[in-house]
């Protein structure tokens, strides 16, 4: 496990120009606007960068299928069979998560996936879990089942006429889950909140620069 944090150290001095601060509810959050990764050769710097880029591209594509066109510098983001550790003897889940601030919201999004073994291109990939929290309140959690939190927290971002159709939306969302598709970018976007999905997508496109 590796955590790349942009939270400034409590006693860090001299970086005020690069620290953003936002108050959400009664909590003040601080974050660095950028960071530099340095270290000796073969220390894992490229792995960190490519892991963040791979997470970003998978989320924006919305599924675990390979990209149709292969033209990016980071091959693993387009051919997911390159992601698993080549030293593994049995498949192990791959986990991605991110926490960020946008439009006055603290967003926590994560998913884990079974991608098979290294170079196993024909493996039946599947999403194992997926979770979205806004301001530390559960919006949805997907494991063996799909569970929703209190959607009143995002009332202003819900699709039109959601209240009139929410019973059917919940039922359809649970029955229509696709093992290879991220719920955030598919069912949640179409049946619950295209606005929230768009905010997350735009942040990944415009703010997560790797």
Regions picked out by a protein language model, each given a short descriptive name:
Residues 8, 13-25, 73-76, 153-166:
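Charged, glycine/proline-rich intrinsically disordered loops and linkers
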Residues 64-68, 106-109:
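Short secondary-structure capping/junction motifs at helix and strand boundaries
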Residues 68-89:
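AAA+/P-loop NTPase substrate/partner-engagement loops
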Residues 107-210:
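Electropositive, glycine-dotted interaction segments
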Residues 87-110, 127:
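Conserved amphipathic alpha-helical "coupling/scaffold" segments
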Residues 8, 41, 100-104, 113-115:
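Short, flexible loop/turn elements at secondary-structure junctions
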Residues 1-54:
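Pre-Walker A-like glycine/lysine-rich segment at the N-terminus of P-loop NTPase domains
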Residues 55-67:
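Post-Walker A helix-loop "phosphate-sensing" segment adjacent to the P-loop in P-loop NTPases
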């Amino acid at each position: 496990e590796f955590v790349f944090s942009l939270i400034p150290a409590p006693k860090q001095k001299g970086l005020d120009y690069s620290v953003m601060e936002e108050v959400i509810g009664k909590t003040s959050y601080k974050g660095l606007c950028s960071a530099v990764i340095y270290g000796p050769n073969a220390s894992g710097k490229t792995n960190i960068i490519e892991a963040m880029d791979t997470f970003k591209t998978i989320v924006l594509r919305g599924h675990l299928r390979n990209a149709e066109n292969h033209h990016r510098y980071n091959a693993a983001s387009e051919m997911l069979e390159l992601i698993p550790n080549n030293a593994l003897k049995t498949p192990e889940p791959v986990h991605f998560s991110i926490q960020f601030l946008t439009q006055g919201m603290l967003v926590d999004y994560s998913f884990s996936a079974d991608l098979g073994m290294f170079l196993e291109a024909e493996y039946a990939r599947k999403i194992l879990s997926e979770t979205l929290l806004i301001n530390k309140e559960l919006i949805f959690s997907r494991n063996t089942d799909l569970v929703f939190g209190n959607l009143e927290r995002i009332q202003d971002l819900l699709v039109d006429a959601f209240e009139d159709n929410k019973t059917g939306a919940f039922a359809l969302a649970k029955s229509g889950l696709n093992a290879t598709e991220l719920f955030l970018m598919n069912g949640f976007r179409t049946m619950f909140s295209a606005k929230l999905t768009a905010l997350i997508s735009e942040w990944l496109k415009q703010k997560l620069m790797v």
